[in-house]
Amino acid sequence: MARPLIISDCDEVLLHMIVPFGEWLDETQPVSFKLIGNDFSTAIRDKQSGEPVEPAEIWRLLNLFFDNEMHRQSPIVGAVGAINTLAQHADVVILTNLHDKHNESRRAQLLAHGIDFPVFTNQGPKGPALQAILEKYQPSKAVIIDDLAQHHGSAKEHVPHIDRLHLCGEPTLAPHITCGFEAGHAHARIDTWEHALPWLLSRL
């Protein structure tokens, strides 16, 4: 008999990302990091000129971080216990927007924190990837957990029958991002695992 399926994002859902990324930049790179609101495009600035770096340089730095610095990421409060509790009631997979070359390192990173589930890497909107995962698992029910409203919008477009929880566990970022629930893409917006877990269990 098919089980329910939880499809969870990683960065800012299970593990902190923006804060350790910014700390690494400030410590080791000729740039500073200060996120004002949710405008990532102007958050990274040259330390000498104060000018924002070019988009290509942002991507280079992000890739460098994921190549070498993922050990800096730590779990969101309550995430490890909650996701493993959910695994007692459903299958769990991780759908993370990273280059495919980082799949194994993400898997190992999560495993080191006690999160032992299949990892699917993706680039761009998550709707098509969600569709493929659902075709593979054929779950009785499914729920996606993600911190970005646009991925809930893509999920609603491609797999509208699944439940969608907008969760951003990074308190410095959560107040500033577009709310997937308010936008009509997610069924709920809950930013702490303490309160998200009962909601998720009720959906299974």
Which sequence ranges carry the predicted segments?
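Metal-dependent phosphoesterase signature
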Residues: R45-V80
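Active-site neighborhood of HAD-like aspartate-dependent phosphohydrolases
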Residues: M1-I58
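Short, acidic loop-to-helix structural element flanking the phosphoryl-transfer center
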Residues: D67-I94, D100-R107
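Short hydrophobic segments within beta-strands
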Residues: I7-D9, L95, I145, L167
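Short acidic-hydrophobic, aromatic-tinged amphipathic segments that line or gate anion-handling sites
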Residues: P118-N122, H185-H195
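Short, charged, surface-exposed secondary-structure boundary motifs
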Residues: P128-Q131, L173-F181, W199-L201
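Acidic, Mg2+-coordinating phosphoryl-transfer loop and its flanking beta/alpha structural elements
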Residues: I144-A188
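Substrate-recognition "cap/lid" segment bordering the active-site pocket of phosphatases
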Residues: H99-V143, A149-E157
